[in-house]
């Protein structure tokens, strides 16, 4: 079966969190929002995992990196 699905459920399309909630500006000081898009190890989650648009993924990446520089978010977490 070339190109077909191999059983299981059909994947649900992820919706962008920012466009669905009407958020236009991503603030680097909003740490609670930024933590939703960072893994437990401190890495920025990719678009295919979070479902964000390319436009907001770029803004999100800049905000997370800025928050890391200001010591609001850690660069890495764990042992």
From Swiss-Prot:
PROSITE patterns xrefs: RIBOSOMAL_S18
SUPFAM superfamilies: Ribosomal protein S18
Keyword Ribonucleoprotein: yes
Organism name: Bacillus velezensis (strain DSM 23117 / BGSC 10A6 / LMG 26770 / FZB42) (Bacillus amyloliquefaciens subsp. plantarum)
The keyword Heme is annotated on this UniProt entry: no
Subunit and interaction comment: Part of the 30S ribosomal subunit. Forms a tight heterodimer with protein bS6.
Function: Binds as a heterodimer with protein bS6 to the central domain of the 16S rRNA, where it helps stabilize the platform of the 30S subunit.
Gene Ontology, cellular component aspect: cytosolic small ribosomal subunit
Source taxon at top rank: Bacteria
The name this protein goes by in its record: Small ribosomal subunit protein bS18
Molecular function (Gene Ontology), one example: small ribosomal subunit rRNA binding
Annotated family: Belongs to the bacterial ribosomal protein bS18 family.
GO BP of this protein: translation
Pfam families: Ribosomal_S18
Keywords noted in UniProt: Ribonucleoprotein, Ribosomal protein, RNA-binding, rRNA-binding
């Amino acid at each position: 079966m070339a190109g077909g699905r191999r059983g299981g459920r059909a994947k649900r399309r992820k919706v962008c969190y920012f466009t669905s909630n009407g958020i236009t500006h991503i603030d680097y000081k909003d740490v609670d929002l930024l933590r939703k898009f960072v893994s437990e190890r401190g890495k920025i989650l990719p678009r295919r995992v979070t479902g964000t648009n390319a436009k907001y993924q770029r803004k999100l990446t800049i905000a997370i990196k800025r928050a890391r520089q200001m010591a609001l978010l850690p660069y890495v977490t764990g042992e």
